[in-house]
Amino acid sequence: MKKTINLPQNYLDAMKELLKEDYEDYLASFEEKRLYGLRINTLKISVEDFLKISPFELEPIPWIENGFYFHEEDKPAKHPYYFAGLYYIQEPSAMTPANVLPVEDGDVVFDMCAAPGGKSTELGAKLDRTGLLITNDISNSRAKALLKNVEVFGIPNLCVLSEDPKKIADRFTGFFDKVLIDAPCSGEGMFRKDNKLIKSWEKNGPEFYSKIQRDIVLSGADMLKPGGKMLYSTCTFSKLEDEETIRHLLRERPEMHLIPIPSYEGFCPGIIENEEDTAMQIEKCVRIFPHKMQGEGHFLALLEKDTDAPENYHAKRKPSTEKLPEELLKFLSHVTFPVQKQDIFIRDSKVYQVSPEMPQEGGLRIMRNGLLLGEMKKNRFEPSQALAMALQMSEYDKIINLPASDERVVKYLKGETLDFENENDYQDGWNLFCVDGYPLGWGKYSKGALKNKYLAGWRWQ
């Protein structure tokens, strides 16, 4: 088999020991084409409504209610709906962690290793504009990509960090209702998708990543409230990175215990090796293999913190008492999106709406705290791209709405000047530019011209 010849022999030996009679089926999966998936953003559109307008041929991912397989040649990243944040392109099995974590309205949620944002975008959609999502990546460059993706998705109640998980754990001990850790790993489940990862595995394999995982999983447990839930996942098959990381957690944090993950055909249980595993109920973990399901592969463990674990008090952020500029208030009079004055803060001319669930800032590298509403410039207010994406079309009263088939939509996304023959197509001031009823960004009409205000760094390339 051509593709498996290049796999390291020590990896093949480990998989043969792991899979036993399924080993040949696993090798055969390398002859199959890689799979492509997209996940619908239910914060902006229902699955039913998206399927009515979808320009792509889609097949349901059986265990993900808002996930679908697509054909590579359809190129959904080159469609205006992608720029409107109606879906996220994600490997099918990688959709599982955020799907499994039982996020509820009003929860305070932490995504520890979040870039580029596949899990965070789903967690934010599940919160449905309630609660608070704090999302983090230790790498500043990756955190920038994360910030863009959560803003494209229109998630308003967020804070984006670029910080060491241990430092965050010290700051937010016992703070979160839900924690997701899609841990850095050796990536064995991605070999079929990207065979360049094989060289990375040979350089830094399971032993390298296991040390990192053992540290961050303890930090995650420490950040949970009593009764809180944590989802640990990897895209690797190594027992050292998977079940053994969970064993380490359960030994070090006896207040944590495994709870069942809803079963689907093809999910495999965690691997039991001894009586301790049985006592810990390691079989409640889930493994996804490419020869069992239509996905590249994943490991998941859902855990809960005992309700009688010690509680921690966190001082709430004080409401804003700032006097808001008249130009800002004038703009907000056109918006029906729920903006509370006591949640608006102005920092270095930038205007933010900060979740009331967010405690006092300090001591952390914050990329974005709250929804960036816009910026004050010489006594005028300029709304942000992030605000445009967080709005529904019905929440603003000056609209330009074009069908996806209109060539001006792509021109807008490229930052080009737009031609409108009919003056009724727009109004003075800031217009919300939409495609088929879904916001893309801003345009400003003044002095007889409509200026394209689509964010330069997001433009269609």
Describe every region a protein language model picked out.
Residues 1-18, 22-51, 296-299, 304-461:
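Polybasic, low-complexity RNA-engagement segments
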Residues 136-174:
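S-adenosyl-L-methionine
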Residues 106-115:
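Conserved class I S-adenosyl-L-methionine
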Residues 127-128, 224-226:
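Helix-to-beta-strand junctions that scaffold the AdoMet/dcAdoMet cofactor pocket
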Residues 176, 229-232, 237-352:
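Class I S-adenosyl-L-methionine
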Residues 116-129:
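Conserved SAM-binding loop of SAM-dependent methyltransferases across substrates and taxa
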